[in-house]
Amino acid sequence: MTSPEASDTPFEPKKILAQLPHMPGVYRYYDTAGAVLYVGKARDLKKRVSSYFTKTQLSPRIAMMVTRIARIETTVTRSEAEALLLENNLIKALAPRYNILFRDDKSYPYLKLTAHRFPRMAYYRGSVDKQNQYFGPFPSAWAVRESIQILQRVFQLRTCEDSVFNNRTRPCLLHQIGRCTAPCVGAISDEDYAIDVSNAARFLLGRQSEVMKELEQKMHAFAAELKFEQAAAVRNQMSSLATVLHQQAIEVGSDSDVDILAVVAQGGRVCVNLAMVRGGRHLGDKAYFPTHVESALTLAEGGIGDESELAEAVDAPADAMPDLPAEEPGRARSDAAASVEAEVLDAFIAQHYLGNRVPPVLVVSHAPASRDLLELLSEQAGHKVSLVRQPQGQRRAWLSMAEQNAQIALMRLLSEQGSQQARTRALAETLSYECDDLTTLRIECFDISHTMGEATQASCVVYHHHKMQSGEYRRYNITGITPGDDYAAMRQVLTRRYEKMVEQAAQAAAADDAAGIDGESTRQAEASSLLPNIVLIDGGKGQVEIARQVFTELGLDTSMLVGVAKGEGRKVGLETLVFADGRTPLELGKESAALMVVAQIRDEAHRFAITGMRAKRAKARQTSRLEELEGVGAKRRQRLLARFGGLRGVVAASVEELASVEGISHALAEQIYKQLH
């Protein structure tokens, strides 16, 4: 049941609180613009939501949030576990400003064994299905590819695409070097290949000793039958497997699947390091840095006045915190930081595991605050999920290594942030841009890419909060111009990019004018919130002049326009900055910190533009002829490409081969053949 408070009525907390039930559920806070501020769960909605408005000593972070609340929505659930699941889904979908957020990494890599007659071993990202076998997830692409190399060396499973497999007439190089048994040409029977697949699967599941024992029995059986060549082949396979196991002896333990989670806080940031053990093999780790946690951690590290502030800093009930003697402020700060780390661990476990595969054991550096979370994970996984807080033996070594790696990753991040912030400051000073908070500095950079006028694309990349924001990158297909006219392309992309922003600001100003508010002030405020502070153009005086004309036509400030004229060979240090407002061109030199930022942004814009252009060009060249075929739609075209591996294979196919494709009749095959020849 969802209970919204209408946004067009004055916000009256007492009236809303009086209507809330004493039931479990999820609550959502909104500001005046309708943006979600916070999503939380509660065992008792009335008590939990009321605590935000009845306590007098809130932390600055929570107090600031409460002042911005303009609307409350609640959803009643049947249990606290159900509320936890709904809360996690809403946090991922809405990304509230005051919730601890982790990047939703849905594309964890897996090792896949396909459901083919001769299963293919492949690196895979995406959602899993029940048709194929999936092993993982793995912490990195490297871990998957290393496992594939091991399986190739020991079990010699195929890795080629089905379209290549179906068209082989002789073994490939992998067979010649002993990395594939060549099922494509019948060099191995179905039964023997199936045994290899089974052994590979058991190896990935941590049952290496079982596989080794069976191979030994198989070798002795061949020897007893005087089949010495087959026995030697199995012996070589055992030798390869023994080598792999020896190399991994330092990593192999008694556990099959374990995840190790270490949380470290320092310098206003938090790092969660996730190490994965799959099949008894330590596959490496990955560091995560949550957002929206900095303010809470700063409060914790700086000391919090009393228990209520400490509790609210991590959004926990005040009465859940221990009583601390007044003479132990150091302990208060330590406990506050630990509470934030526990809250971060809770958020990570919920956002990372709910809806995904969960190993049977989680080794953690901090005890999570929510007991319901573990119960929900066990229910979802279909097996008990154990949480180990104080591990022993090998697990303890793994946790210690994960904590050390978390500290190293956090120190590296803080160091990089410091140097990057210094470079941003140097750039702002070089361009005479005054700003109290450089984290708000937004830079957009444009580049044009094409091949002799073909497949022209423009790119726009964004630099904000001292780093590149890849989620805000945009590509623009350039049409209606003379091929190769970079000036016309630059005019088109700048007009398309900023014309809408100017229109939005004008509409907001007109609405305020009608309401009796100063529309010009609104227009300026709206424009400043939408537009970048600096616009970089990859080009010299000609491109900058075109940009100046566009900005003048749109009524925008031309002083924000800066051209980056590349030096000889695009070498960093030889660039010249060209200004649209008439300032003298500036050469920064190789040692300039400001130039490092400019070169980083410019090179990223060039990379983004050229990759898009190449993809567009390749698509046009590879599929244009098939798209022009009469009687061949998208599905038939896809089947042809899958069957023959590309346009070249389709062109080389005979009428009979074309007719063997599903959905292609003999008459249509003849028609296709005639159109392609």
From Swiss-Prot:
Keywords: Cytoplasm, DNA damage, DNA excision, DNA repair, Excision nuclease, SOS response
Example GO BP: SOS response
GO cellular component, as recorded: cytoplasm; excinuclease repair complex
SUPFAM superfamilies: C-terminal UvrC-binding domain of UvrB, GIY-YIG endonuclease, RuvA domain 2-like
Gene3D superfamilies with a match to the protein in the record: 5' to 3' exonuclease, C-terminal subdomain, GIY-YIG endonuclease, UVR domain, UvrC, RNAse H endonuclease domain
Source superkingdom: Bacteria
Subcellular location per the Swiss-Prot or TrEMBL entry: Cytoplasm
Domain UVR positions: 209-244
Domain GIY-YIG: 22-100
Family: Belongs to the UvrC family.
Protein's job: The UvrABC repair system catalyzes the recognition and processing of DNA lesions. UvrC both incises the 5' and 3' sides of the lesion. The N-terminal half is responsible for the 3' incision and the C-terminal half is responsible for the 5' incision.
Subunit: Interacts with UvrB in an incision complex.
Protein's UniProt name: UvrABC system protein C
Provenance organism: Burkholderia lata (strain ATCC 17760 / DSM 23089 / LMG 22485 / NCIMB 9086 / R18194 / 383)
Gene: uvrC
